[in-house]
Amino acid sequence: MKKRIAFWFCVLCATLSGYAQSSSLQDYVASVRAKSCAPVDYIFKLFEHSDIVVIGERDHRDTTQYELILDILRDARFAEEIGYVYTEVGCVNRTKDVNRLLQRKYKTAQAFSDALYSYLRNEDFNPLWDKYNRVQFLRGLYGINRSNRHKITLGLTDCNFSWDKIKTAQEYRDFDDSPACAYRDSTMSLHFAEMYAKQKPKNGKRKALIITNHPHALNATFAGKDYHRQGKWLKELYGEDNVKIVMLNWTEYTQKEQMPLVASGLWDAAFEVMECQPFGMDIKETPFGREPYFNARYGDLKWEDIADGIIYYKPIYELVLTIGIPGIVSIDFEEELMRRIRIYFEAMDRPVPPLEEAKPMYDRFLSFPGTYPQSPHSVRDTIRHLITE
């Protein structure tokens, strides 16, 4: 593999030296070679000097990122030295329920699946959360806990909500318009802080891994507004150096019709030159860190302003977006689903679909490429063209 990497690097130097863009690509590759390490090791390296690590999740629907997240949790160091993981997904008042699910033993796999689905039907303030990676994550975490003497505790940070207490569309509107929802980043930060303060220290330290979507993870404030993102709140609460924010590789998600590659594809091209070997690295004072951040809503920021590090795990053209949880809408649950659908859709001023249309929205398993609306092949070719043009 080292010979192939050296070959690609020579190609860059020899064939692209005349182009301004090639110099930038060479800088990115050199930076990765000099500063990076394996993603799991990178996360634990951050924990050596910081108590809280935030992973900025890419598209909520992507399943490949949870392969990495479960690898981190599966590492013996996590249960022994960290012990606590928090997620954006999941209403805070369901935290005790999810830990009962994850820390007890079930006689059969089917018994766990039944308990998991029963829990999932009440975890979120949407009629149902349809992202399959939630099943993937909770199954994986249950398996880790089942085989470990040291158990991992999961904290849920989203708004307090119970479908049992919502009877009308107006009641749902009142919830949706509440300050807790309007300022979700503040709400999730507060919920984390309350649970974090109650953690049992391990080796004299409280440590935690937080998984939240990329926009929430930002160390940023909306330009001209007094509205911090979750990452910004956490750094203010616990200290700039005590909280480390790491972004998973993704696209410039704000342009959803095109989903352009970051830095015109140079980051992905550098990853390609490294034969897509996963890596994590700090980005301060690197070409990655000096790259302007693509979302102008936060002002004139660079990547090193909004995050401490990046992880490249899977090339963009291998990401898989999956929705639908087969079997989540059982016959016994159909009536309750339609009750929620009527309330939710009326509250959102949308036409209420019949059961035959509503049910597949949540339990029909559907996967498509993470490059959507572009094809994986076209994105891969675009990236490789940057190396060989």
Model-derived segments and spans:
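Bacterial Sec-dependent N-terminal signal peptides
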Residues: 1-24
